[in-house]
Amino acid sequence: MIYSSAENKKVKEYKKLKQKKYRDKTKMFLVEGQHLVEEAYKNGQLQELLLEEETNYNLDIKTIYLTKPIMKSISSLTTPPKIMGLCKKNVVKI
């Protein structure tokens, strides 16, 4: 399935993750780019793989396809990558 609407509930949640308050509340964050996605996957933090439509990348995890304008709207970078990941924050108690 490809999400193409900015009004989609999941897309709105991804956009909210730009706010620190929302990241802290949900204990989730986005990583951008293949290297960071792979590191998050290796560490068990990756919850969802976000790919620009027609991008081929295989990980054994839930994959969401987004249109280029949607990827741009949720990215914090000037040039958004074709690969992003939704990650869970690890809470370390001291």
Residue ranges and their predicted role:
Residues M1-P80:
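N-terminal positively charged helical leader segments and presequences
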Residues T78, I83-I94:
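Acidic/glycine-rich phosphate/pyrophosphate-binding loops and surrounding catalytic core
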